[in-house]
């Protein structure tokens, strides 16, 4: 028996895998916003904060220090965690905030400075001797920011600042931030879901089915189907398991889950090949054999290994894509201290510096591997798509101003710079942002349509046939894109598709029943969607139509926009356009550059559901489309109002 990667488990289960326990302090998220704030705003869902920290107590002044400098005005924040109450009883609680704040304890609002006087509100609350969840939301317009939480304990004669000993936060949090202005709205905002914010719930053309047993809570790292219709999933958790899911289409509706293997190190890809399940774990492809046919793997055969796989929490091995006689997987870069480093453990064991952040090609018969493409950061999602080509997602970070979907080709370079120095520690001066990168198929503006894109899959039937779906771990839901090839380069448009799922989406797979199976995942901190961390569901197409943009394709003089249904009166004024570009930098993420807002210069109706828009075109720019005052011929509002087209090439007339 070849143990292979199972020996890695104790040392390589990364820090991002779900931990339990508490640490001292209150967790604080802060979003940079613009415009005048005179009431408590709501930050649009799906946007990561600009600043993320754990503070000892709520006595905060003058703003917050962040990656982009100090944030002093026009921001929205949230402090949350648990209050550790040592003495039960009746407490007086006082909240001070310039400009406004609310405090909820145990899910009930107890303080609101906007209904108090002089930026202060106080109230009485009965607190039990236990850990009590709290959520403190605040905002700052201009002036000197001040936020303070005080209490008067039973028997005290006056208020005092709630001490550090009374605050608890989740231990082992993953701190995910991003730069730039974040979107917000007020209760009086008339914009609908799907217009400047995520769509509301499940797509109208699909039915959501939750079929997992209630006590089965998988954090799914990979998913595939066996020839007999059963599903195999691997889990990114402390078990490191492979499960077989049976009865997916039984008339009784009783789904059964059986453990097939365990002890794998961060399994994040799985495929059924040559009669066995093959799994990608950290630093290895492992073939799982059930020689005695008892329903459990008894042989773990290392098929391929040897690429860097350090203990670094961010050095993953993702995916397992069979293509002909080759296998393809992706590796991410390790992170440390705010910079990206190549640091494969305590010794320089691997002489190849460009393997982290690469697509690897593996000979299936020999296990020999080589670098197929590189310049990636966190390529958590790869699959076969349009024209049978491979596409891979990548996540915003250093050198990636926002997330993107890339066309995978031999020798491709996708932008992430990694240049080790003589001691294997790259220095900022050695990182060369001028190194040209292959353009993405689509840029995915952060917090607007995606934060952490995952696995793409080709759609083979239904209204979106020929397009691609892809999931998202922290923005949540599934998005879609139409792709076209212009002058030999792939490019296209990204659209919001669905929300309403039980967790952020890590893996997608079409079942033999023609349903889309959805694997959820999540971890500590804000590396999750709405604090949900597991999920297994599926979407079934109902045949019902929903009014929305079906596709956007470029023309020599503009774009052709096609809808799923005939439209009512339509013209150039129904489209608000914004164009912008991105540029790499060594810091996390990046702003939109050269932003212009405009209306199309002309419009021509091509069919009852298609229009051609005329406008100036600039290669290397993203074009955002926003529908305004547009309804279908039946009087229906759009399901989603926005789309983003990445223009790499302009077709010849």
Segments (PLM) and residue ranges:
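Extracellular/secretory pathway-exposed regions associated with glycan biology
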Residues: 21-92, 96-202, 209
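Bacterial N-terminal signal peptides
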Residues: 10-20
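Surface-exposed, short loops/turns at beta-strand junctions within beta-sandwich domains
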Residues: 128, 616-622
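Short, surface-exposed alpha-helix to beta-strand junction/turn motifs within ectodomains of secreted
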Residues: 561-602, 625-633, 641-645
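Beta-propeller domains with acidic blade repeats across secreted/periplasmic ectodomains
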Residues: 173-551, 555-558, 569
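Structural beta-strand segments of beta-rich domains
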Residues: 89-91, 557-561
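Bacterial N-terminal signal peptides that target proteins for export
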Residues: 1-12
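Extended, polar beta-sheet/loop recognition surfaces of beta-rich domains
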Residues: 92, 632-653
């Amino acid at each position: 028996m070849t143990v292979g990667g199972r020996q890695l488990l104790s040392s390589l289960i990364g820090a991002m895998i779900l931990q339990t326990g508490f640490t001292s302090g209150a967790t604080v998220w802060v979003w940079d916003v613009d415009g005048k704030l005179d009431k408590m705003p709501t930050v649009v869902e799906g946007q990561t904060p600009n600043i993320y920290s754990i503070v000892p107590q709520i006595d905060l002044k003058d703003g917050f220090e962040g990656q982009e400098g100090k944030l002093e005005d026009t921001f929205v924040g949230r402090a949350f965690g648990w209050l550790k109450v040592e003495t039960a009883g009746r407490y007086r609680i006082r909240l001070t905030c310039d400009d406004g704040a609310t405090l909820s304890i145990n899910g009930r609002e107890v303080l609101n400075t906007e209904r108090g006087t002089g930026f202060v509100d106080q109230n009485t609350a009965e607190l039990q001797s236990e850990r009590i969840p709290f959520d403190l939301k605040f905002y700052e317009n201009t002036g000197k920011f001040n936020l303070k939480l005080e209490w008067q304990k039973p028997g005290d004669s006056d208020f005092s600042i709630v001490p550090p000993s009374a605050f608890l936060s989740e231990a082992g949090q993953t701190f995910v931030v991003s730069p730039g202005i974040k979107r917000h709205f007020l209760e009086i905002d008339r914009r609908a879901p799907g217009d400047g914010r995520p769509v509301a719930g499940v797509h109208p053309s699909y039915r959501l089915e939750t079929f997992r047993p209630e006590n089965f809570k998988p954090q799914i790292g990979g998913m595939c189907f066996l020839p007999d219709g059963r599903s195999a999933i691997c889990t990114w958790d402390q078990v490191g398991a492979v499960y077989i899911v049976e009865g997916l289409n039984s008339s009784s509706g009783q789904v059964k889950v059986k453990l097939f293997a365990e002890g794998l190190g961060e399994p994040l890809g799985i495929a059924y090949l040559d009669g066995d399940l093959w799994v990608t774990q950290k630093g290895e492809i492992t073939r799982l054999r059930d020689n005695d046919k008892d329903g459990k793997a008894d042989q773990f055969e290392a098929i391929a290994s040897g690429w860097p796989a350090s203990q670094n929490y961010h050095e993953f091995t993702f995916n397992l894509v069979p293509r002909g006689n080759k296998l393809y997987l992706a590796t991410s870069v390790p992170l440390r201290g705010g910079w990206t480093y190549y640091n494969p453990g305590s010794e320089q064991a691997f002489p190849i510096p460009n393997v982290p952040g690469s697509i690897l090609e593996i000979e299936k018969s020999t296990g020999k591997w080589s670098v197929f493409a590189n310049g990636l950061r966190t390529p958590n999602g790869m699959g076969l798509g349009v024209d049978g080509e491979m596409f891979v997602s990548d996540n915003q970070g250093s050198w990636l101003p926002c997330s993107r979907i890339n066309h995978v080709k031999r020798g491709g370079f996708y932008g992430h710079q990694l240049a080790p120095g003589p001691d294997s520690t790259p220095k900022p001066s050695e990182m060369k942002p001028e190194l040209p990168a292959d353009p993405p198929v689509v840029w995915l503006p952060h917090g607007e349509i995606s934060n952490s894109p995952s696995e793409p899959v080709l759609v083979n039937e239904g209204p979106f046939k020929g397009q691609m779906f892809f999931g998202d771990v922290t923005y949540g839901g599934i998005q879609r894109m139409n792709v076209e090839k212009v002058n030999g380069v792939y490019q296209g448009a990204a659209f919001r598709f669905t929300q309403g799922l039980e967790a952020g989406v890590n893996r997608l797979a079409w079942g033999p029943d023609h349903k889309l199976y959805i694997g959820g995942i999540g971890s500590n901190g804000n590396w999750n969607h709405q604090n949900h961390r597991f999920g297994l569901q599926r979407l079934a197409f109902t045949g019902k139509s929903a009014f929305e943009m079906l596709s956007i394709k470029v023309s020599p003089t503009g774009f052709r926009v096609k809808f799923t249904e005939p439209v009512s009166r339509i013209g150039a004024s129904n489209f608000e356009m914004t164009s912008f570009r991105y540029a790499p930098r060594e810091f996390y993420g990046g702003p939109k550059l050269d932003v212009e807002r405009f209306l199309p210069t002309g419009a021509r109706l091509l069919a009852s559901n298609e229009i051609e828009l005329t406008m100036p075109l600039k290669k290397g720019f993203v074009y955002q489309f926003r529908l305004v005052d547009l309804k279908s011929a039946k009087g229906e509002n759009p399901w989603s109002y926005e789309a983003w087209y990445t223009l790499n090439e302009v077709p010849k007339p």
